[in-house]
Amino acid sequence: MSKAATAERARNRRGGTMTRLIKMLFGFYPVLLPLVVAGVVLCAIINSIGATFLQSALQVISESWQSGDWTAAQPKILKLVTTLGCIYAVGVASSLFWNRAMAVITQGSLEKLREKMFNRMQDLPIRYFDTHQRGDIMSHYTNDIDTLRQMISQSLPNLLMTIIVIVTVFFIMLYYSVWMCLVIIAGIAFMTFMTKLLGSNSARFFIAQQTELGVVEGHIEEVMNGQKVVKAFCHESTAEADFDERNEKLFEVSQKANMYANILMPILGNLGDLLYVLVALTGGIFLALGVPNLSLSGMALSIAVVVPFLNMTKQFCGQIGQISQQINAVVMGLAGAERIFELLDEEPEADEGYVTLVNAQVNPDTWQLEEADHHTGMWAWKHPHRATGEIEYVPLRGDLVMDNVDFGYTPDHEVLHGVSVYAKPGQKVAFVGATGAGKTTITNLINRFYDIADGKIRYDGINVNKIRKSDLRRSLGVVLQDVNLFTGTVMDNVRYGNLDATDEECIKAAKLAGADDFITRLPDGYDTMLTGNGAQLSQGQRQLISIARAAVADPPAMILDEATSSIDTRTEAIVQAGMDKLMEGRTTFVIAHRLSTVRNSDAIICLDHGRIIERGNHDELIAKRGYYYQLYTGAFELE
């Protein structure tokens, strides 16, 4: 594609972004924003008409000078000054109003935008976060929002005012003299050409600057999260070099963006001064030669016309320079808005499920399952049959079957090949294998964080694609290897598993997980405030809270994704007793580094490069003397 075509597409994209942004602002403030526009227009008109009062005053002075009678001039001048003062007072009041209102509109719009972005982010699939750096995502909430703030609060109102002033002053100049207006038009055409030439390059680099800023912030966030690893491997110099490379790219595009922006104003300022001189020369020559004036007012060309015309020329050129200055801020704001809209336009996680999870009870008269409006401790799948319209209640038992499943994180690279897994209600099924064998991938598919490429997954005989994702995930308690604790009290973090849980239920869950003992020894017990992902706790303590969080949800099925791999041996013994109680009567999928945690599993599935190579319980697999036997005896390593 040619550079011209690319530039044209970029202009069209920015135009669409501006239109969408303005529509959005009017949608947020349908009454206040039009009032602001009216206030800005009023201020612009008032700022433009000063020259007309100067012309009237000069006309009065000229007539009095010629007649020698100054008595009639005094009341006329006083009237002009009083009128001008009243008009400017209205302008000041209007300016105060729209500036205060614009602050409300700006901050309110940004608040709503942040809400929209965060809500959209909650609807995005896990795949989005796998392919986007967290720092780049955070940049939407910081840099992009900040550039948008400057644009909405300052640049857009000033740009509108500048355009109104230019249009108003231009028509006033036409009213006084068409001949001198032609000189203005010729000069403005050249100034517009320079603005377009330099401004387009500036806009291109400002957009690149926002993108590179997101890359730099993403890299900083990544290194900060892995700071221990950087120091452990003595890679400080490598990290610095990687950062310098990204920072250099940001410097290059920022330098070019600001270079074009900074040279534009002096050039336009000098062109404006040159135009002022040309208009002054033209006016003087016309006066000296007695050239007949052509104007909408019909006035003859005189000092009373030329002097205010020169003032308007200076004002006109100054406003052209203001436009070029505001355009840079607008372009930066549009670059930020475009990135924000890209996030808002991301496709949400698809969910065509219609089977829901409900509290159930047995009708004493019919002995049939029915939906209950309160917590009964019994769960059922509410399955509407679309063909007949009948509703079937299927007991949630935790019977899960994966039938010949293929899956790849990218279409051209499969990581699971023909995997078939079955778990009977209440069974403990363990996945073992080396890193990359596909253990965690299987649990991601059970949760429907990703959708399979081929095959079927059935939960209690129901295709999981028919089950609403939120209900499917509510039926599965999850303990992840990477623990995330949120800013809040210990009680809040335990309750995260079930926001309706009482304090007593949270404490009971903590006791089950073996976390109550250390929690009660914290300075404020369950009211101890956690910050920085629970940085004041040990890895084992954080893991125990994560397990308690899963326990308070009281899920019918559990996924333990390498739950005890980061816990010391003593803590593991504490956890294991609680976990055994938690797993009673529940279908449980376990992934662990230590084979001691899976020895009592009903079924152990051995994976290698996305394929199941062995299945059986511990004794059966030891007797086979195959892959599991090699792992157990230390001939192979689990990781």
Question: Positions of the model-derived regions?
Answer:
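Juxtamembrane helix-loop junctions of ABC transporter transmembrane domains
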Residues: 7-15, 46-59, 87-134, 138, ...
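Transmembrane helix-loop-helix hairpins at lipid-water interfaces of multipass membrane proteins
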Residues: 31-97, 174-179, 281, 290-303
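Alpha-helical transmembrane segments of multi-pass membrane proteins
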Residues: 39, 87-106, 157-164, 183-209, ...
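Helix-loop-helix
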Residues: 64-65, 172-186, 260-338, 343-347, ...
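ABC-type nucleotide-binding domain
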Residues: 70, 360-639
